[in-house]
Amino acid sequence: MPKAAVYSGEKGYEELCKRDDIDLVYIATDWLHHFPVAMCAMENGKNVAIEVPSVMNLKECWALVDMSEKTRKHCMILENCCYDWFEMNTLNMAQQGVFGEVIRAQGAYIHNLSPFWNHYWKNGEGDKLGWRLDYNMKHRGDVYATHGLGPVAQALDIHRGDRMQPLVAMDTKSVVGKA
């Protein structure tokens, strides 16, 4: 097997996306690079698979949709929490009727990282937190909303013959992060 090509640096992905022998770019970088890498890949004729969150705001979301439609390239958002053992087992039980007819479901993903603020990924010696914890400290709310929503949507067959009509999100006083 040939040795894997390595691309590095802030814009290293641009060279990767220009290759003719690649059909799909799988994006599992820090969150702030998901969008620019996806756009570059589709602009260069590649299909895209992006870990969540795929974008950081609604403007970027529509830009991905528009680029996918313009280039006719797939842009698939990946939600790895749909495929862990517990979630797959629960989905199987729901599909087998173990719970009866599922008519209401509730999901959440709570990942308090404050105990790790001094022991997590760093971007260099001067970096106190690293990109992941920096984001958690500066923002409130569920930064991985699809982790809780994805498995529930699968169990309810959302977009497989059913769809969400009301969607409710709640917020309480901040325990960690921005007040």
Identify the residue ranges that each predicted region occupies.
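Short amphipathic alpha-helix with an adjacent loop that forms part of the alpha/beta core around
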Residues: 13-20
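Beta-strand-loop-alpha-helix segment that lines the small-molecule cofactor/substrate pocket
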Residues: 24, 30-31, 35-83, 97
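Structural motif corresponding to alpha-helix initiation and N-cap regions
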Residues: 9-11
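Predominantly a Rossmann-like dinucleotide-binding segment in NAD(P)-dependent oxidoreductases
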Residues: 71-76, 81-179
